[in-house]
Amino acid sequence: MKSDSVEITTICPDVENSQFVVQSNCPETIPEILKSQNAAVNGSGIACQQRSLPRIKILGTGGTIASKAIDSSQTAGYHVDLTIQDLLDAIPDISKVCDIEYEQLCNVDSKDINEDILYKIYKGVSESLQAFDGIVITHGTDTLSETAFFIESTIDAGDVPIVFVGSMRPSTSVSADGPMNLYQAICIASNPKSRGRGVLVSLNDQISSGYYITKTNANSLDSFNVRQGYLGNFVNNEIHYYYPPVKPQGCHKFKLRVDGKHFKLPEVCILYAHQAFPPAIVNLVADKYDGIVLATMGAGSLPEEVNETCMKLSLPIVYSKRSMDGMVPIANVPKKGSKEDNLIASGYLSPEKSRILLQLCLAGNYTLEEIKHVFTGVYGG
C-alpha cells in the first residue's frame, strides 16, 4: 500500500449498516466524513463501528391485531387476547431492525377507546419522544383514524415518526395480516426517511397520513383510503416514499389541559341527516351537549327548517358530510349575517374528525371566530 493510500474493508455490501475498517498510513487523507461520532481511532487508522440500531417504543392498545378466534377461518366474533410480547413473538426478524421497548397501555376493542385511554396514548407518546427514534401504536381499525387524528392534533413530535398499525383479521386467521402490518410499521418508524412526516398509518403495504385517512370498508383487507393520496408503500422489505417529508397543511396543534389525573373533553355529538330529518332532534341534543356535528346530505345540504333551527341556537354546529369523500365549503353553510354565526363548515374533515377538532377547540375555550379559523386549515370555517 502506498504511503498516501487508503484501504477499506467491509463485511457486507450494505455500507449504511455494515461494519467496516479503514486503514491508512496517512490518517489525514481519510475523508472528513469518516471522522464522525460513529468512528473511533484504532491503531494506524480509523475503525468505523457498526451503527447502533434505532430505538423504537411500541404502545399497545388492543384491537383485531391482538385478537383470537375459535378457528382459523373465523373473521368475526373474535376477542382481544394477545399482548405486545405475543405480537412480537410472531415476527422474530424484527430484532435485526431495531431495539424495542413496549408498554401495554390497555387491551381493548377500539370501539371501547374513551377519553381516559386517549389520554394514556397521548401521555405514552409524549413521554417517549425524547428517548426513542420512533413510536408505533397498535390499535383497532374501527376508530384508528380518530385516535391518529387526535394525536396529530395534540402532539408536536418534531421529526420523530409516530406510526399507527392494526389489522383486519385476527391472529388466528389462516392468512392473518397483523404480523406483516406490525413488521412494516416498525420498519417505517425505524427508517430515517420517515422523519418529519407527522403521524403515519401503516396498513396493507400502504403508508398514509394519519390526519386524513378514513376507514372505508368494514371487512376488506384494503379497508382504509385517503383521497389526499398515499405517502408511500412497502415492497419486498423496502420503504418507498413518493414525496419528500411534509406534514398536513393547516393542522392546528392544541395544548391539552388536564385537571389532575382526570381528562375530560367537552361533549359533542354527531347527528346523521336523512330525508325528512326532523329539526326536533337538533333541539333535543342542543340542551345536553356543548357542540353538534351534522353529517349532512351532499356537501352541507339540510332541510330549510333544520337550518333555521340550527341558526337559532347559540352552540357551535359543524356541517360535515355523509359521503366518505368530498368537502363542505363555507359557501354551502347558512349564515345569520353577524359575528354570532354559529354554523361552521367542516371542509374536508369527516364527521368523526370534525367532532374531535370541535372538542379540542371547546376545551381550549376558543371563540366562534377562533373555531372557524381553525377549520379554515382544512378549507372549512
Curated annotation (Swiss-Prot):
Subcellular location: Cytoplasm
Gene Ontology biological process: asparagine catabolic process
Modified residues (Phosphoserine): 350
Gene3D superfamilies assigned: 3.40.50.40, L-asparaginase, N-terminal domain (3.40.50.1170)
Cleavable signal peptide: none
Asparaginase/glutaminase domain boundaries: 54-378
UniProt subunit comment: Homomer.
Binding site for substrate: 110, 141-142
CDD domains cross-referenced by the UniProt entry: L-asparaginase_II
Protein name as it appears in the record: L-asparaginase 1
Catalytic activity as recorded in UniProt: L-asparagine + H2O = L-aspartate + NH4(+)
Disulphide bridges, residue numbers: none
A Gene Ontology molecular function term of the record: asparaginase activity
Predominant place of localization: cytoplasm
Source organism phylogeny: Eukaryota, Fungi, Dikarya, Ascomycota, Saccharomycotina
EC number(s) reported in the record: 3.5.1.1
Family indicated by similarity: Belongs to the asparaginase 1 family.
Active-site residue numbers: 64 (o-isoaspartyl threonine intermediate)
Alphabetized InterPro entries for the sequence: AsnASE_II (IPR004550), Asp/glu_Ase-like_sf (IPR036152), Asparaginase/glutaminase-like (IPR006034), Asparaginase/glutaminase_AS1 (IPR020827), Asparaginase/glutaminase_AS2 (IPR027475), Asparaginase_C (IPR040919), L-asparaginase_C (IPR027473), L-asparaginase_N (IPR027474)
